């Protein structure tokens, strides 16, 4: 008698293409800039029995918690193993785990990775001094109710005066985002060859949804 099929259903976020850009960016930030040095990247050939998993990226967080971005492929075997891709975002601590949305995942990551404004920046701004720290993960603050201090620092960082639209600072940050991703895609061979070039500047991380190309 044929045994019953057991199905495991998990929430996933569909993406339009392959995951090379995501993998390259993780390796770039892990090995090149060292900003994700503690992150574990597990490629598909080391995953083991889960043949539908193309990668696992595990971010250690505070208080012994973890955020895992698990990439899936070949999700439509009944249609001939089409090249369909998706990701699953999971937060877990010891024996408890839960799936999270991309915006929550960004907030969790920003609590441990990519620098933000320090507590002294408000006093520096009031005294008219130069701001020494900036938020390199702006998308992690979306969906939150920001404080007036944070909004003021964001205005200073972005260089907006309320009438002239985008400043060179915001445009530069967008260029930095594109540059980080572009360098990540070309960095794999260079890193393997032991390049002696200096480390890249601190990265402005555009957020998981943008990097992965998550489709809402």
UniProtKB/Swiss-Prot annotation:
Counteracts the innate antiviral activity of APOBEC3G. Forms a complex with host APOBEC3G thus preventing the entry of this lethally hypermutating enzyme into progeny virions. Functions as an adapter molecule, recruiting APOBEC3G to the ubiquitin-proteasome machinery. Targets APOBEC3G for degradation through the assembly with elongin BC complex, CUL5 and RBX1. Binds viral RNA and affects the stability of viral nucleoprotein core. May play a role in viral morphology. It holds the Pfam family Vif. It comes from the Viruses. Keywords: AIDS, Host cell membrane, Host cytoplasm, Host membrane, Host-virus interaction, Membrane, Phosphoprotein, Ubl conjugation, Ubl conjugation pathway, Virion. It comes from Human immunodeficiency virus type 2 subtype B (isolate UC1) (HIV-2). Homomultimer; in vitro and presumably in vivo. Interacts with viral Pr55Gag precursor and human APOBEC3G. The interaction between Vif and APOBEC3G is species-specific, which may play a role in restricting the replication of HIV to humans. Forms an E3 ligase complex by interacting with human CUL5 and elongin BC complex (ELOB and ELOC). Residues 161-180 are annotated as: Disordered. InterPro entries: Vif (IPR000475). A motif (HCCH motif) lies at residues 110-141. The BC-like-box motif mediates the interaction with elongin BC complex. The HCCH motif (H-x(5)-C-x(18)-C-x(5)-H) mediates the interaction with CUL5. A motif (BC-box-like motif) lies at residues 147-156. Highly phosphorylated on serine and threonine residues. The lineage of its organism: Viruses, Riboviria, Pararnavirae, Artverviricota, Revtraviricetes. This is Virion infectivity factor. It is found in: Host cytoplasm; Host cell membrane; Virion. The keyword Phosphoprotein applies. Residues 154-168 are annotated as: Multimerization. Required for replication in 'nonpermissive' cells, including primary T-cells, macrophages and certain T-cell lines, but is dispensable for replication in 'permissive' cell lines, such as 293T cells. In nonpermissive cells, Vif-defective viruses can produce virions, but they fail to complete reverse transcription and cannot successfully infect new cells. Vif-defective viruses show catastrophic failure in reverse transcription due to APOBEC-induced mutations that initiate a DNA base repair pathway and compromise the structural integrity of the ssDNA. In the absence of Vif, the virion is morphologically abnormal.
